[in-house]
Amino acid sequence: MAGNAYSDEVLGATNWLKEKSNQEVFSFVFKNENVQLNGKDIGWNSYKKELQEDELKSLQRGAETTWDQSEDMEWETTVDEMTKKFGTLTIHDTEKYASQPELCTNSTCIGSRGPGFRALEHTKYSCCGHCRNPEHWGSWFQSLPRWSTEPNLVRDRGGFESVLRCGTVEERLQRAAELGLRYDGASS
């Protein structure tokens, strides 16, 4: 219906222009004695035309493929960078950073510095294992193998990511022990 109404409006305007074309004022504006209008009714589907040339089609396909690949590569690059960053972080590093005064709050084993800035809470439930307070250590820390000839590497990507998802250092060490990762006990 909308197409028919549009066509009727176009025909009405064309007929009006043809009727008025013989009048003196109208012909003076167009500076032409005999005005002829030629038109074509254009529908919405006429605006998207398929390309006729094979070369242009291949260029379009190539551009679309390149765009898709660039988006995929950006995503993969970001994931690979994150994995590399996590790969360099060992279990010992997480303990070392968790035991730093600026990373702990409400700590009784760090000293008299008081509460720090960061969000990690240092209690007997989330102890770093290096503090001077043995009651914070618990049996889980002593049960971990402390000597290993193997380097502190991760066997699979998913296991290490699950270790990093754990909230506290204690949970990380427990998860690492479940996965068979070794804690070498070295301090730097």
Curated annotation (Swiss-Prot):
Superkingdom of origin: Viruses
GO biological process: exit of virus from host cell nucleus through nuclear pore
GO CC terms of this entry: host cell nucleus
Key words, A-Z: Host nucleus
Keyword Ligase: no
Localization, UniProt: Host nucleus
Role this protein plays: Plays an essential role in viral protein synthesis. Plays also a role in active nuclear export of mature particles before host cell lysis, by interacting with host XPO1.
Summary of subunit composition and partner proteins: Interacts with host SNRPN. Interacts with host XPO1.
Protein name, as recorded: Non-structural protein NS2
UniProt organism field: Murine minute virus (strain MVM prototype) (MVM)
Origin organism lineage: Viruses, Monodnaviria, Shotokuvirae, Cossaviricota, Quintoviricetes
